[in-house]
Amino acid sequence: MREKSNYYKKRDENAHVNSKIIQPSGLFKELRDIMPKNSSITLDAGTLCLQATDEFNFYEPKSLFTPLDFGLVGFSFAAGLGVKLAKPNSTVFSLMGDGGFGMTVSELSTAVHHNINTITIAVSYTHLTLPTNREV
């Protein structure tokens, strides 16, 4: 337990929260600070979401929903709507890149039509793209 506590402390100390461009570590720290413990998180495929699986604290079972085994870009927003319907008392956070967010037009109209409220965070991958990060 102490080792886990030390990891969390070091993770928060190393988060980049004061840079002009919001870095993923800073985003994750800010979200950790505000997320209720009963939150559910949906992720898209991509760099941000690979990082997110290690960066969030999960307090309840069935609180992380991700397509990482299938690489489904555009999964997060639609999954968030389904999670919110299944768990109406949970605060649902959906994280995705700008490409995944661009695939959510029909789901946006569904959310508005049925008054399904989730928190959606779309990150611009101008300099964080997976292909760029994998280049040597």
Where are the regions that the model predicts?
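Thiamine diphosphate
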Residues: 50-125
